[in-house]
Amino acid sequence: EGREEYFPRELSGGQQQRVGIARSLAIEPDIWFLDEPFSALDPLIRREMQDEFLRLQGLLGKTIVFITHDFDEALRLADRIAIMKDGMIEQCSTPDEIVLNPATEYVRKFTEEIEKARVVTVEAIMEPLGEAKTSTNAIYGNKKLKDVAKILASDAREFIPVKDNNDQIVGHINRTMALDIVFG
């Protein structure tokens, strides 16, 4: 508001980033390419821009190719991640899969400092349907393990039921395995 007459070079870094994203959307691309779109921003503005990016992605439903050297950013924003080394893809998969099952030693080292419970969803370790037949105290499959850690720690059942967003039981998780990821 009030900056319509300014050139991009006259704007702050965060404002320039917003203008760049708006310009890239103006042509309504089928695939949206973003190369380090948040790299020049301070941490607070960066987080706000990431939140806005997630909101726009949900609203527009665009396929987005997002290039970043910030693995935490990739984990937060991506449905699929490609980790590259020397111009070759080492692994291309979901954040869950990359963190739980690194394909190469390079990927393992790349992910070893990541707090798995912050990345891994309940559904990533869920067994479809199975022993957990009851919906009593079921947990949502789309939740991160860190978000259900208290439930996992206090629930004595070996298998905890998992439900989808329609509250239908879709499977179960092994509590011990989940706790190993949370505290391992």
Locations of regions flagged by a protein language model:
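Conserved signature/switch motifs of ABC ATPase nucleotide-binding domains
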Residues: 6-9, 27
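Conserved ABC ATPase "signature" C-loop
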Residues: 86-87
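The conserved cystathionine-beta-synthase
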Residues: 134-157, 161-166, 171-184
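ABC ATPase "signature
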Residues: 92-93, 101, 172
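Hydrophobic anchor residue at the start of the ABC signature
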Residues: 21
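Catalytic Walker B motif of ABC-type/P-loop ATPase nucleotide-binding domains
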Residues: 32-35
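A short, surface-exposed alpha-helical micro-motif characterized by mixed small hydrophobic
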Residues: 74-76, 99
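Conserved H-loop
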Residues: 61-67
